[in-house]
C-alpha cells in the first residue's frame, strides 16, 4: 500500500517553515504546544462569532506564533484583513484580551499583528473554507470544486488537487471524489506544495476536504 505522508512535514526545512517558533525544555514542551493550540482556537472562534460574512470564509491562511521569555508575538496572515480591521483598534484589543484571558498569562506580554497576503485563494486553508461554505449551502460538490479551481487559476498557481470524502450530495454510501488541474508533484521534495485538511459538518454528516496546491 502507498504510505501517505503529510506534504508539509515532508518539506520542513526545504520549502516549508515552522508555524511555531520557540524553544522549551523537554518537561515544558507539551505545555507550550497546548498553549499554541489554545491561541489558534481562540482566534478562530473569535472570528467565527464576530465576522459573519456571506461567503463564510474567515480568510486565515496561517497563524504564526513566536515566543520569548517575556513576550508572545502572534502574526495572523489573512487574505481578507478588512474583516478584522474595520473597527481596527477596538477589535484587535478585544481579540487580545480574549486570548490573554484564555492563556491566563501574567508575566508575559501578548502582541497580535495582522499581515495581509496576496492571492488569498492561492492558499489551501482559505480555499477549503470557501468549499466548506458552498457545501453547507447545498451546492453540488463538483460545482464547488470547479469554482475553487477557477479561483486558484487567478492566483498564478501551477497545479491544484482537491479531494472530498464522505456522503457526497447526501448519498447513502460514503465515497471519495477528487479532481486535479495542472501538475502536483507530491514525490518531489523541492516542489513548493501547500496542503490543508479540513472537516465540514453538513446535514448529511461530516465531509473531509483535502487540498494540495503546487506553486513552483
Swiss-Prot record:
A Pfam short name = Ribosomal_S3_C
The record, for NCBIfam families, names: rpsC_bact
Gene3D superfamilies, per database record: 3.30.300.20, Ribosomal protein S3, C-terminal domain
Quote the InterPro entries the UniProt record gives: KH_dom-like_a/b, KH_dom_type_2, KH_sf_prok-type, Ribosomal_S3_C_sf, Ribosomal_uS3_bac-typ, Ribosomal_uS3_C, Ribosomal_uS3_CS
Keyword tags: Chloroplast, Plastid, Ribonucleoprotein, Ribosomal protein, RNA-binding, rRNA-binding
GO biological process per UniProt = translation
Query: What's the source species for this entry?
Result: Eucalyptus globulus subsp. globulus (Tasmanian blue gum)
- Location(s), subcellular: Plastid, Chloroplast
Name the chain's protein.
Small ribosomal subunit protein uS3c
Give the domain of life.
Eukaryota
The GO molecular function terms of this record are: rRNA binding; structural constituent of ribosome
Q: Subunit composition? A: Part of the 30S ribosomal subunit.
Q: Which residues cross the membrane?
A: none
Family assignment from sequence similarity: Belongs to the universal ribosomal protein uS3 family.
Quote the cellular component terms of the Gene Ontology held in the record.
chloroplast; cytosolic small ribosomal subunit
Main localization (coarse): plastid
KH type-2 domain sequence ranges: 43-118
Amino acid at each position: 500500500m502507498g504510505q501517505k505522508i503529510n506534504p508539509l512535514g515532508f518539506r520542513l526545512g526545504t520549502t516549508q517553515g515552522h508555524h511555531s517558533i520557540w524553544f522549551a525544555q523537554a518537561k515544558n514542551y507539551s505545555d507550550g504546544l497546548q498553549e499554541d493550540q489554545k491561541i489558534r482556537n481562540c482566534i478562530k472562534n473569535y472570528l467565527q462569532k464576530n465576522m459573519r460574512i456571506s461567503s463564510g470564509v474567515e480568510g486565515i491562511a496561517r497563524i504564526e506564533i513566536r515566543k520569548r521569555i517575556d513576550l508572545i508575538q502572534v502574526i495572523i496572515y489573512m487574505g481578507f484583513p478588512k474583516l478584522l480591521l474595520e473597527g481596527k483598534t477596538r477589535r484587535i484589543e478585544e481579540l487580545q484580551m480574549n486570548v490573554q484571558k484564555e492563556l491566563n498569562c501574567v508575566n508575559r506580554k501578548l502582541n497580535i499583528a495582522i499581515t495581509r497576503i496576496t492571492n488569498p485563494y492561492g492558499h489551501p486553508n482559505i480555499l477549503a473554507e470557501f468549499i466548506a461554505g458552498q457545501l453547507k449551502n447545498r451546492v453540488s460538490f463538483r460545482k464547488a470544486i470547479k469554482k475553487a479551481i477557477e479561483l486558484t487559476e487567478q492566483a498564478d498557481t501551477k497545479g491544484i488537487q482537491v479531494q472530498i470524502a464522505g456522503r457526497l450530495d447526501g448519498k447513502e454510501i460514503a465515497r471519495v471524489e477528487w479532481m486535479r488541474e495542472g501538475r502536483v508533484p507530491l514525490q518531489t521534495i523541492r516542489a513548493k506544495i501547500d496542503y490543508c485538511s479540513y472537516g465540514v459538518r453538513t446535514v448529511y454528516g461530516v465531509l473531509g476536504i483535502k487540498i494540495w496546491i503546487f506553486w513552483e
